[in-house]
Amino acid sequence: VTIVCNFSQPAEGQPALLSADEAGTLFHEFGHGLHNLFKDVHYYGVSGVPRDFVELPSQIMEHWVFEPEVLKVYAKHYQTGEVIPAALIEKLDKSGKYGQGFATTEYLAASLLDMDFHILKDVHDGADVMMFENAVLGERGLLEQIPPRYRTTYFNHTMGGGYTAGYYSYIWAEVLDCDAYEAYKE
């Protein structure tokens, strides 16, 4: 199992430090790594894990990235070793909730677009994918100011990588991971 990430390079002479977003990405990808590590299959491609479930292990890991007990283990000043202050932990928690409606709308728009691409019956020569995208989103009443997570011209998930007509699994996994996390917290 490997985890490959594309994090920001440090300025010359500076240490490589992760932003809060990059730490979240690392925990997310680590969740995928754990999921793959604990599968009991010889060949990865035939693991039998439904697409609806595949994001759950990675997304549940995102809950722990800013847990105070976890932060105290890894979020330390790189020079002094001082643990992240409680006030900053509280600010991180609040900032993670900011813009959640915007993010959910981005994912929903991308999920609807993905589904509509895969129920197309007639596609004529010279079809304009951006016109199709605008029509799909307009029919659903989505705001132009909140575009899909990925625009059609660079939405790799929808045409490959195992997420064809399954991009909604990110939103569904969020429902499942929040429920599982709350059960853990109880």
Model region roles, listed by residue range:
Residues 1-186:
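Cation-handling catalytic/transport regions enriched in His/Asp/Glu
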